[in-house]
Design a protein with these regions (language model features):
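Conserved catalytic/switch belt of AAA+ P-loop NTPases
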Residues: 130-147
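Charged, glycine-rich active-site and insertion segments that engage polyanionic ligands
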Residues: 1-50, 71, 141-142, 151-205
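Clamp-loader machinery-focused feature within the broader ASCE/P-loop NTPase space
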Residues: 1-127
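A short beta-strand-to-loop transition that corresponds to the Sensor-1 phosphate-sensing loop
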Residues: 120-121, 147-152
Length: 205
């Protein structure tokens, strides 16, 4: 997993996250809204890693070396929970109750926060959203919930109103090209083709 310094674009979101971490002014619930490939999971993972870091830098950046960071990088940090679902196109009320509501009452194992990352949050059924809403309305002080979605409008207005909304914008073409040429070592003419195809979405490049 990279650091915030390695993320291409999204500087306003990174600045906001870093300031929140530095000031210890973290909300209980966030929505990261952006199209597929825009970097929602990367930002959520880096945010979670920074919150749990045991030796965080002054700018809010995770150290990447402590036990918590190493666990986060390998996907084994016990207080960073990735919510999954068995059915391909829906997150059921049982998924939310089992993985979030019933688990969130247990205090963090080794960290200050207990963080739940819900990818494809727009796949939650109405029942699942209502179940989650109760937790968002009265969360434990250590809880942080991150909803990742391509369509925030699919979430209940009552959920949206209780979350901090972070919208991932398209990245400038020159930043995409610079990354492709410098980091991926793609030649100029190929980078231009990739940039045209990406349309500001690093995941498509």
């Amino acid at each position: 997993m990279s650091s915030f310094k390695d993320v291409v674009g999204h500087k306003n979101i990174i600045k906001y996250i870093s300031s929140a971490v530095q000031a210890d002014a973290v909300s209980h619930a966030y929505i990261l809204n952006g199209e597929r490939g825009s970097g929602k999971r990367l930002l959520a993972n880096l945010f979670a890693m920074s919150l749990q870091c045991q030796n965080r830098a002054e700018d809010g950046e995770a150290c990447g070396k402590c036990q918590s960071c190493k666990q986060a990088q390998s996907g084994n940090q016990p207080d960073i929970i990735k919510v999954t679902h068995e059915k391909p196109n829906t997150i059921s009320v049982d998924d939310i109750r089992t993985q979030v509501n019933n688990d969130i009452v247990i205090k963090p194992y080794s960290s200050k926060y207990k963080i739940y990352i819900i990818p494809e949050a727009d796949l939650m059924s109405a029942q699942a959203q209502n179940a989650l809403l109760k937790t968002i309305e009265e969360p434990p002080e250590y809880a942080v919930i991150m909803l990742l979605t391509e369509n925030a409008e699919a979430l209940l207005p009552t959920i949206r109103s209780r979350c901090v909304m972070m919208k991932l914008r398209n990245i400038k073409d020159q930043l995409v090209k610079k990354y492709l040429m410098e980091q991926m070592e793609i030649p100029d003419y190929k980078a231009d083709v990739c940039v045209a195809f990406a349309q500001g979405n690093m995941g498509k490049a």
